[in-house]
Amino acid sequence: MNTVRVTFLLVFVLAVSLGQADKDENRMEMQEKTEQGKSYLDFAEYLLLQKLEELEAKLLEEDSEESRNSRQKRCIGEGVPCDENDPRCCSGLVCLKPTLHGIWYKSYYCYKK
């Protein structure tokens, strides 16, 4: 009976001491993994930041191109006198000599195409 108790006590002491070692090892492994995870997260965050900056640059470039190209210079509306040599009629309008009602004005006007 004493041998059983001694054996049990010996196994218990070994289990506790090895368990403590495993606990310390587990703690060290967890710290290493979290440090690696942080570095991976930092790297992933850095890559994501680069991609977002590239997208932002593309969007800003497109916006600036749109604002330069899409804005129409001041134009003359329909039925407004225009210069024959330098017509500034808005898009969809043409600078033409009036047919009936404006013959006496001797001027060109913007009309729809």
From Swiss-Prot:
Predominant location category: secreted
GO cellular component: extracellular region
Tagged with keyword Disulfide bond: yes
Record key words, sorted: Disulfide bond, Ion channel impairing toxin, Knottin, Secreted, Signal, Toxin
Chain positions listed as propeptide in the UniProt record: 22-74
Tissue specificity statement from the Swiss-Prot or TrEMBL entry: Expressed by the venom gland.
Coiled coil region boundaries: none
Signal peptide: 1-21
Annotated region described as Disordered, given as residue ranges: 61-83
Cysteine-cysteine disulfides: C75-C90, C82-C95, C89-C110
InterPro entries: Toxin_22
UniProt-annotated location(s): Secreted
A Gene Ontology molecular function term of the record: sodium channel inhibitor activity
Function: Probable ion channel inhibitor.
Description of its domains: The presence of a 'disulfide through disulfide knot' structurally defines this protein as a knottin.
Record's protein name: U11-theraphotoxin-Hhn1a
